[in-house]
Amino acid sequence: MSSSEEDDGYVPFSKRPEWSDVKPLAQDDGPHPICPILYSEVFKDKMNYFRAILKSKEKSLRVLDLLEEVIQENPSNYTIWYYRREVLKAIEQDETIEYDIQQEMNLLNDMGETDPKNYQIWNHRRFIVEKYIGSDNKEKEFLSGVLLEDAKNYHAWSHRQWLLKTYRDWNGELAMVDKLLSLDHRNNSVWNHRFFVISNLNPSPFPLSLIEREVEFAFNHIRHSPNNESPWSYLKGLFKGQKISTIYPSLLDILLEMKSKYIGCSHVNSIILDIYQEQNTKISLENSLNICKLLSETIDPIHKNYWNFKYNTISDQLKLIN
C-alpha cells in the first residue's frame, strides 16, 4: 500500500478484528494478462474481501458496511448494488438483526449529491422506496431539490414520474412545473413533465376545456420566446388523436396573426401547414404548398429535404381533389 493511502487513515480489512475470519479472494486475471488494470491498493483490498463474501454468500450487517466502502470506490458497479439489495432482503427476514432503513436513504442522499446521474444509485433508490418507504412526501421534496439543481437530470425525472404513477400523489406538480419553467422556459424536460402530468389526470383525447387552457399556457411562453421549440411541440401534442381544424377551428386565425407578427418563425408556419393539410380543400392545400416553399427556401433551409418531402406529399394529396 502506498504511503499516501496509509496517511489517509485507511485500515486494511486484514487488520480489522471483525474480519479476521475471512480470507480475501484476489482477482484472477490468468497467468499472463495482456493489459491488467492498475487498481489502487485500497480498491484491491476492498474488492478482495467482497469476492470472498460473494463466494460464501454471507448476508449480514458487516457485509453492508463492506459494500458501502466498495460502492464509494466504484458507485457504478452493478454487482455491488445488486448484492446489497440481496443482503437487505435477507436482513429483513432475520428477526435477530435490526437495521434502520433510513440509513440506506441517508447513504443514497449523500451519494446522490456527489454522483447525481449515476443510474445504479437511482435504481437502488427505487427499490428502497418501493419495498420499504412507500408513499412519502419527503421523496418528492428530495426530487424537487435535485431538479432545482439540475432540471435536466433524466434519472431524477424518471424516478419522479415512477413515484407519481405508483403512489398517485399529484398535488403541487403543475406548480412545480411552473416554477422550473420560470427558471428556464426552454427546458424540454419540464415541458415533457407537464404533458405527463396532464395526460395522467385527464381522459384521452383531451377535452376542449383543457386544450384551451393549455394552449393559452403555451402561448404565454411562446410570446416570450417565439423561436423556442418546446412550447410549440407541447401545443401540437395537445391535439394528439384529434384534428386541430375540427376541435379548435379558431386556433388557425390566432396562428395566422402570430405568423404575421413572428416573421421567420418556422414553428408557427409548421402548425399552420398541418392545419391546412387537415382541412384538405383545394385552397388549403395550395396554401400548404406555399408554406412548404417558404420554409424550404427561406425560413428553414437546413431542413429543406423534409419540407420538399412534405411538398411532394401534399401535391399528391391535391391531385386526388383535382
Curated annotation (Swiss-Prot):
It is an enzyme of class 2 (transferase). Its EC number is 2.5.1.58, 2.5.1.59. InterPro entries: Prenyl_trans_a (IPR002088). PROSITE patterns: PFTA. One of its GO terms (biological process) is peptide pheromone maturation. Residues 1-27 are annotated as: Disordered. Pfam families: PPTA. Gene3D superfamilies: Protein prenylyltransferase (1.25.40.120). GO terms for molecular function: CAAX-protein geranylgeranyltransferase activity; protein farnesyltransferase activity; protein geranylgeranyltransferase activity. The keyword Magnesium applies. Keywords: Magnesium, Prenyltransferase, Repeat, Transferase. It catalyses: L-cysteinyl-[protein] + (2E,6E)-farnesyl diphosphate = S-(2E,6E)-farnesyl-L-cysteinyl-[protein] + diphosphate; geranylgeranyl diphosphate + L-cysteinyl-[protein] = S-geranylgeranyl-L-cysteinyl-[protein] + diphosphate. One of its GO terms (cellular component) is protein farnesyltransferase complex. PFTA repeats lie at residues 62-95, 103-136, 138-171, 173-205, 213-246, 287-321. Belongs to the protein prenyltransferase subunit alpha family. Catalyzes the transfer of a farnesyl or geranyl-geranyl moiety from farnesyl or geranyl-geranyl diphosphate to a cysteine at the fourth position from the C-terminus of several proteins having the C-terminal sequence Cys-aliphatic-aliphatic-X. The alpha subunit is thought to participate in a stable complex with the substrate. The beta subunit binds the peptide substrate. Heterodimer of fntA and fntB (farnesyltransferase). Heterodimer of an alpha and a beta subunit. PANTHER family: PROTEIN FARNESYLTRANSFERASE ALPHA SUBUNIT/RAB GERANYLGERANYL TRANSFERASE ALPHA SUBUNIT (PTHR11129), PROTEIN FARNESYLTRANSFERASE_GERANYLGERANYLTRANSFERASE TYPE-1 SUBUNIT ALPHA (PTHR11129:SF1). This is Protein farnesyltransferase/geranylgeranyltransferase type-1 subunit alpha.
